[in-house]
A protein has these predicted regions:
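N-terminal Rossmann NAD(P)H-binding glycine-rich loop of SDR-like oxidoreductase domains
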Residues: 1-26
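NAD(P)H-binding glycine-rich loop region in Rossmannoid oxidoreductase-like domains
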Residues: 59-97
Length: 330
């Protein structure tokens, strides 16, 4: 089984690579080769029985996608994207990377020929939905995004559905919850503060909160996100029928509830490292995001996530902090 990971240098790409190398198989088949691709250098890969190669390049550049699929990988994880805040700030870059790059990949797959139809797992987003919202958004709710990022993801969902319908590939679009708590340095995603206000205080640093504590959002841990990707790849798009986009399980909670969970686990002094500093641009973007979902379709297929935000924090402590946190005197 040959695997291609596009966007392999990102947080999910790294964790997915680690998971695949550690397990050595997917869908009951041994993994013989993993090709990692990104516009930046990927970190050194973990030890693996599979042959691991790494390439740098831009999927939106002519010929790059054709080069990647020439080896006919069996499963393709397409994780690469310009994130929400950056896609809103740089209109041309967002469409070039998020839409043109994806279209290039789909066309490259289509032109391989010889009955080649790989399984494609695409990371979409709950940003494909726009207000006004019902109390809980199901998969049947209209995709009407209110940001450039959400629009780009929604267009790609339609393309993947059509290319799957035509038999060029076996694709599925995963409407991922906001992944929290993201390790490492903050990125340019407008949603980054959801992770920052947990990760930084746990590491002994102050964090900025740019929105009100009443803001509600939909979360899942990086561990759950990797499990979503692997389960989708093993399941295949046929399980989704004609509707190839699916909203994945998560946890709906307010920023205030996040901070209550942080204090319960790490103490009041750690909670007090979060400082309110309103940012009108971020507040405007977040105000158009959905808050709660009915993921019963995904759950019926076996997808699972955390049951509480305390669980999400504990996953971060276990996976990123060696099971312990830095505290200060109360």
């Amino acid at each position: 089984m040959q695997i291609l990971i596009i966007g392999a240098a990102g947080m999910l790409g790294r964790k997915l690579t680690d998971h695949l190398c550690r397990n050595g198989q997917i869908a009951g088949q041994p993994i013989t080769k993993i090709l990692r691709h990104d516009v930046v250098l990927c970190p050194p890969p973990p030890a693996s029985a599979a042959a691991i190669s790494t390439e740098m390049g831009d999927l939106s550049v002519a010929g790059e996608a054709e080069r990647l699929v020439a080896a006919r990988p069996d499963i393709i994880f397409h994780l690469a994207a310009v994130v929400s805040g950056e896609a809103e700030a740089d209109f041309e870059k967002g469409y070039r990377i998020n839409l043109d790059g994806t279209r290039n990949l789909l066309e490259a797959i289509r032109h391989v020929g010889g009955n080649y139809a790989p399984r494609l797992v695409f990371t979409s987003s709950i940003a494909v939905f726009g207000s006004p919202f019902p109390d809980a958004i199901g998969d049947e709710f209209l995709a009407s995004p209110l940001t450039s990022y959400g629009t780009q993801k929604a267009i790609c969902e339609l393309l993947i559905s059509d290319y799957s319908r035509r038999g060029f590939l076996d694709g599925m679009s995963l409407r991922m919850p906001t992944v929290c708590v993201r390790p490492g340095l903050p990125n340019k995603a407008a949603s980054g503060f959801f992770s920052n206000i947990i990760r930084e205080p746990l590491a002994g640093n102050d964090a900025v909160l740019p929105v009100d504590e009443t803001v509600r959002h939909w979360h899942a841990s990086p561990r759950s996100a990797v499990n979503f990707l692997v389960q989708a790849a093993e399941m295949g798009g046929a399980a989704l029928g004609a509707r190839r986009a699916i909203t994945l399980p998560g946890l709906s909670c307010t920023v205030g509830e996040q901070l209550v969970a942080l204090e319960k686990i790490a103490g009041k002094a750690v909670r007090q490292r979060v400082k309110s500093q309103p940012d009108e641009n971020i507040r405007r973007i977040v105000a158009g995001w959905p808050q709660n979902f009915d993921a019963s379709r995904a759950k019926s297929l076996g997808f699972r996530s955390e049951n509480s935000f305390e669980d999400i924090i504990r996953v971060h402590i276990e996976d990123e902090l060696g099971g312990s946190i830095k505290t200060v005197q109360q």
